[in-house]
Amino acid sequence: MATFQLSGLPSLQIENQTVGGLGLPTVPQYAERPNTGVMLAQGLGAISERLEANKQQQSEADFMKSLGTAYAANDRDAMKQLAAAHPEQIERIQKGMGFIDQDRNQMIGQAAMDLRLAAKRGDQSLIASLQKNVPLLGQFGLTPEEVFLSYKQDPQQFDKMTDLIHLHADPKSYFDVQDKQEGRNIDRNKLAETERSNRAGETLTMRGQYISGANALTAAYAPTAAMQNYRQYAEMLQSDPDAAMAFANAAGINTVSKKLMKVEKNDDGSVTKYYTDGSEETGKINQPIAGDGIKPISLPHAQSIIDKANEGSKKAAGFALRLKDSMDSMHKLGKKIDTKRVALINRALGEGAIANLSLSPVEQQYMVNARDALYAILRPETGAAITLPEMQEYAKMYLPQPGDSTLATETKMKKMQGQYNALRGQSGRVYDALVVSSAAYNQRLQSDGRYTSKSGIQFKVE
């Protein structure tokens, strides 16, 4: 039997050394040996863990490959099925990307969608969206400047990145948006097919009218920011009225006036008219369409006037329409701007898009419309590319400047109104026709999807 000697304690050594001769059996000494059963169990466990890890890695790889293939093919149904069948994979990806809870995931998904849609509307819209999402970008260690530069360097990669972030952060919201877009595409396709079958005999006539209307718009560089905002506002009114009102407030849309935004042709041959005050009116296609600031005119009559008008009248109407939209938005937004920041707003005119990041969203919207207004005034006078010095000089003539009195500011707005009146007078009835026709262009021609002007108005030009 083993014995131990601990310091300070009596020895446990057997003192009677003759005890062995007493015929007592010797206690056997056992050496510690490996437990084969335990070792085998541990080995099998390790192998099982490795197999399970390999299986998990393979499952993750298969999922990512399948999802990537479905995404590349724009197969929304396949992506939905994968997400529904493998929620654990979505959760794993979310945790890996720092998406830690449902509320945060929804915020990230919404921000990604906002940035993606804003980028499609142009630099100014993207800048406004980046400014709005500064706190969320900061949580990822990003600045608006960095994100904006990444977009400018590779717009397609930016579009893909924001789309995938939305997909992984909030799959439900992502697929809801995709379904709504698909629904709109289906509706547009049905409308297009109905028009093709019912109006095949009028194809050549309508084609000539489309081209004539498109030329009038492009020749005058029809409204950009304002037209995009009106179109988006009209769509939001149908899907989310509360959000539409918030958007109108931010974009400088006067929801009290009854300004015509959109004319939509229905399957039964009637038309629905949408106005900025949120009202809708349905009538026959030959029924005159009214709106604030225009004399009532039917859609066919409007197209006929544009088709017969000379280029000078078309251009004057286009510039007048652009100037009017910009002035309306400037008037609405100007009430919200701190006059102490007017100097900064005016300087931003020549400092490029990055400088605008220092402006508030309302000031950015104001500047977008101010630029459009100056272009509408300058373009008819110069007939050529507009230089920065020209823009700066005209800004002093028509926009508020540091030190301007209230009377001086009012005088400048009257001068801008005078420019609009002159253009309106040159255009004659073509202006009314263009207001109605341009409101109908976007809806009717989107189904063909041939071309998008700088204003966001889509049409076919051959």
From Swiss-Prot:
<dbReference type="InterPro" id="IPR031619">
    <property type="entry name" value="Inj_translocase"/>
</dbReference>
<dbReference type="GO" id="GO:0046718">
    <property type="term" value="P:symbiont entry into host cell"/>
</dbReference>
<protein>
    <recommendedName>
        <fullName>Putative DNA transfer protein p33</fullName>
    </recommendedName>
</protein>
<dbReference type="Pfam" id="PF16928">
    <property type="entry name" value="Inj_translocase"/>
</dbReference>
<keyword id="KW-1171">Viral genome ejection through host cell envelope</keyword>
<keyword id="KW-1162">Viral penetration into host cytoplasm</keyword>
<comment type="similarity">
    <text>To phage P22 gp20.</text>
</comment>
<comment type="function">
    <text>Component of the phage injection machinery. Required for injection of the phage DNA into the host.</text>
</comment>
<keyword id="KW-1160">Virus entry into host cell</keyword>
